[in-house]
Amino acid sequence: MTQLALSDLIGKQVLGVAGTYGTQDSEMDVYICGVNILSDTSLRLIFPNGHQLKINQKVTVHLDNRTGVSEYDADLKVYRSSFKGLVTSTTDTQAVLSAIEYEVYYGVGIEKSFRIEGYKYPHDDRPATDLPHSPLVEAPCMDDSENDNKIGVLMTFANQQPHSTVMAFLSSVEDDIFFITFPSTFKAKLLSRNNQCYFAIDGRATFTFEEAIEWNYSIISGNVYEIPKSSPVFPQIQELFIQKNPWEMGFFSHPEITMYHLKANKVVCPKQKH
């Protein structure tokens, strides 16, 4: 693994997607925030509209270095990490996190990792169930304005704190989100235990920090359904994925993939301090 600093891999100042559990286990608060990487084990999160984070609250921050990138190869060769941390200090518009655990991926390999002494991955004894099938009978009209946004960030309900991952996606004009993965992945297993999730589309393919601080993004929350291969919608969506992301044609055509439909309950606005 590399000896490079986290900021060398990700960048010193990036956009992040932060997720934390609310007062109830079934609630998740999700923010788009600025991130200053202070060290390999410390982040400063910046919230232009304020936040509701508290000292000692566990927060997961998705980090990657894809700002300004709109094309990828099949191995997704960008540095990316699901940074799990603890809030150590706050102001009205900022919060500092101390790292609990993270792994930085590049392609399919781990380039850098950290975990505090004594950390163990939390056991998850929630039962897995088959996802309900999507009610769609035909592919919806897709949102062409999101064509430059090749990948977004999926936040799922893991034990203790959320899990984040980047996903190639399609979005409809009705805020449906579609994504594809293998059923053996950690995110797929989490969805089989709780099919609620959040999906953030942050526009970082065309983002610069010099632009207006009110960043162009949306956060979709809802329930995930499976689109079975027997459904007439499956090949329609599959072809649309290949058109949007031809660099992943081999993956989208793999016989073992599972296709998911996030049916939006609402578009989540950024959490603000009241």
Residue ranges and their predicted role:
Residues 1-274:
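Binding-site signature for planar aromatic cofactors or substrates
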